[in-house]
Amino acid sequence: MRLLIAAMSGIACSVLFNPAMGSESCASRSDAMALKTAAVQQQLMVAAFMCHDTNAYNLFVHTYQTDLQESDASLKSYFVHRLGRRGQAAYDTYKTKVANLAGLSQARNDKAFCGAANRLFAEALESPASLSSFVEDAPSPPGFRNVCVNVPTEVRSRMRLHIAQARSSGSR
């Protein structure tokens, strides 16, 4: 089972980071947010069916309908921009693979999966003001953990400085 899950994760990541996708090797922050939003939505959709809680999913979709539609349009644009005519197929494949990975996660531990899904639904509906803040704070769904995000140079420099300071203060 672990081998199957690892293979599925690899397939999902290869859809995202195929060298043929162009010179940009990483997603922008907004593209990464669209990728993660789709992954979280697919995870919640699978959870709704597997855990028999379609009402929670329907409320989630209704609450964030406009944001979800905008994010989905951005996701399609991401794939079309990178892959041209093959973009729509890659978009469909990505969403299918993410849903399949969520289903595999559920198959490994039904009780834990449904408990985590219930907590995720509660968090999503607790503060409906911002889908993006919910998605940012949500745990990364299976298959999403290896997404590479372009970080501006000045942010990278500040991150390196912060890490160096943390290391030096920890070694005292």
Predicted regions and their residues:
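Bacterial N-terminal signal peptides that target proteins for export
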Residues: 1-8
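Short, intrinsically disordered, charge-biased short linear motifs at domain edges
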Residues: 13-15, 36-37, 132-138
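Compact alpha-helical subdomains of small soluble proteins
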Residues: 64-172
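Immediate post-signal-peptide N-terminus of mature secreted/exported proteins
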Residues: 23-59
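N-terminal signal peptide c-region/cleavage motif recognized by signal peptidases
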Residues: 17-19
